[in-house]
Amino acid sequence: SFEGGRVTMRRTVKSAPQSIWYGEDRPKYLGPFSEQTPSYLTGEFPGDYGWDTAGLSADPETFARNRELEVIHCRWAMLGALGCVFPEILSKNGVTFGEAVWFKAGSQIFSEGGLDYLGNPNLIHAQSILAIWASQVVLMGFVEGYRVGGGPLGEGLDKIYPGGAFDPLGLADDPEAFAELKVKEIKNGRLAMFSMFGFFVQAIVTGKGPIENLSDHIADPVANNAWAYATNFVPGK
């Protein structure tokens, strides 16, 4: 809203969620076989399954910082996982790319003709890895600095769940629905982080993208699985 020529935005609404994913009776990491939950893990925050063997959440300030880092990395991982599989899916369905496999696409910048974004020379044509690196640092640094340091649009808002102009669809308007969405985000984000790790391992071991690896596994599960490729981790083999 506009008040006296200034832009103001609502804060993210906080309330005690009634969802099964919060509170003392929330699902635990080993279900009924879980050990005693640490006293500092009360089920107040999304994604708390009562597991902290290393005691990383014992200090409140460290816990708050780690929660912020986890959510940010979850969001990057979800975007990254989508970026790894989507071009391959499009390529397999007839869409022309210069290179659809995620870990091979960037290497085209070292080729004689450079890199055309989406295989189209009329879009961005990149020839310098240093220019790409500098642009990445500046753009991502600006966005992250704005998020951490705050700015006119984010003043007074939660760093992790700002709401306001950052929630144009109003997904956080209903506190109960918002509490559920937080849980879905952290669960899918953790899965995406593991997926990205798996994509890296696949790239090193098989030299193929995730969709091609999946197709190979479906075609011949016995010959194309983790156990069959395990010897590739042994140096010299």
Swiss-Prot record:
Define the transit peptide region by residue numbers: 1-9
**What GO molecular function annotation could you give as one example from this UniProt entry?**
metal ion binding
Q: Which residues carry this modification: Phosphothreonine?
A: T12
Q: Which UniProt keywords apply?
A: Acetylation, Chlorophyll, Chloroplast, Chromophore, Magnesium, Membrane, Metal-binding, Phosphoprotein, Photosynthesis, Photosystem I, Photosystem II, Plastid, Thylakoid, Transit peptide, Transmembrane, Transmembrane helix
Q: Which SUPFAM superfamilies match?
A: Chlorophyll a-b binding protein
Annotated compartments: Plastid, Chloroplast thylakoid membrane
Q: Which residues cross the membrane?
A: 71-91, 123-143, 191-211
Let me see what the UniProt entry remarks about domains. The N-terminus of the protein extends into the stroma where it is involved with adhesion of granal membranes and post-translational modifications; both are believed to mediate the distribution of excitation energy between photosystems I and II.
Q: Could you tell me what this protein is called? A: Chlorophyll a-b binding protein 5, chloroplastic
Cite the source lineage. Eukaryota, Viridiplantae, Streptophyta, Embryophyta, Tracheophyta
Point out the gene that encodes the protein.
Answer: CAB5
